[in-house]
Amino acid sequence: MERKKIILYNPYAVFFDMPLALLAIGTALDPEEYEVIIIDARIDKNADELVLLHAPDALCFACTVLTGSPLKDVLRISEKIKQAYPLLPVIWGGWHTSLFPKNPLVDETCVDITVQGQGEETFKELVTHLAQQLPLENVKGICFKKQGEVIQTPPRSLTDMNKFGRINYELIEVEKYFQKKGKRQFDMITSIGCFFRCAFCADPFVYNRKFSAYTAQRMADDIEFFYKKYQFTDLNFQDETFFTYPKQIGELATELINRNIKITWAATMRADQGSRMSDQEWATCKQSGLRRVLIGVESGSQEMMDWLEKDIKIEKVLFCAAQCKKYNIDVIFPFIVGFPGETDESVTHTVAFVKKLKAMSPGFRTEIFYYKPYPGSKITTNMVNEGYELPASTREWANFDYIGSSGPWVSKEKYTFFQHFKFYSKLGWEQKRIYLAPLAAIARWRCNKNQFKFPWEKALIEFLKPQQKLS
């Protein structure tokens, strides 16, 4: 029996994590029935040529879609496909279509079907229906066009992650990702969803505060299998909240030690999760290779933290920081500034907390981002109800910058202050080049005094190393 060809496309982006979403849906398909072709625009220099090469005999062309520049690339390649092969079904899935199920179908002629939420079972059913020309109304968790009308099917419930088979990384050339990263770093995801209700996050909207994760035994078995097969030295867990069940992660760490898996690893952690870990669990995680955690702080103001519905006390952040310092574990602490109505007092608390964390350990990094009203979050919903206008079309969302710039409600003075503080705090506490030590000392003084006038050091740094801007 001739296998049906499925093209899966990962759009261009500036990061090089393995395409875990595409690997998940590709693995869900029966390899005896389907030939899965993953094309990654970040890795494959001739990505467009490969897409057009495989398109003539493909059953469908599917993309994973993130809002912003990745969406722009998906629009471009989808249009190219439709112009060359107008009858080939084009499917979009991922975060953007989970938040905007119908919009791409209304706005664009190059999209036929969108997928919402967890994709493994949905995509498997979808391609079966396409192959057998069955009515798509019976596939849960999709939107599609039919005779000019956009039809949305009922949502699909979250499936237990342990019911899915081991991810087939043979669908990609793993060595290419090692080469692109410059190290043998392997990517895995062991859970989906999130229990928590953060008001700035879209997760509660997409997954309805549901969560599913591999068991410790399943994680250990998979890691051991991939470790022996790919001989990686570092493991990067891409889970939203990896330490949701701290005891289970402690059990995993013990398994890694007992199985003599010699790696380092990094993962995400909420401060309330880390604060529930015993000293022994921290020590075991470190012994197993834990090198870094990412702990979202968002604000140094408890009042702002409560408004954001983080359900975390700042004291727990400090506890985790102290534990990470004790066990020599690096930390990335992301903060978000520039919320609508954010007070100067809140900013002052955040700046002070950033400096406090940086001073605790040279292995602590703080990343400061500007709030952007991303759909699905409680804050954004309230802003829209109060008259704020979000981008109106798919094309406008493709031009949405949710990383670099601040919202229009942030004054020019406050934006300039944040930009200076971000630059000088990195230079002052994260700079490791010896010849810049004098500038680092000046930068720390500037941050401690909040004195950022005449930023001559920034101009000098950018002159010396224009390819390594610190801001």
Segments from the language model and where they lie:
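Radical SAM enzyme core and accessory elements
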Residues: 2-11, 31, 47, 54-59, ...
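Glycine-rich beta-alpha loop elements in corrinoid/cobalamin-binding modules
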Residues: 5, 21, 25-157, 372, ...
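Short N-terminal binding/cap micro-motifs at the start of the first secondary-structure element
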Residues: 15-20
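Residue-level recognition of beta-strand->loop/alpha-helix junctions
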Residues: 38-42, 205, 335-337, 370
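Flexible glycine/acidic-rich beta-alpha junction loops that bind and position SAM and/or redox cofactors
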Residues: 100-101, 196, 247, 303, ...
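Catalytic cores of alpha/beta
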Residues: 101-107, 341-355
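Radical SAM [4Fe-4S] cluster-binding motif and immediate context
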Residues: 162, 167-332, 339, 352
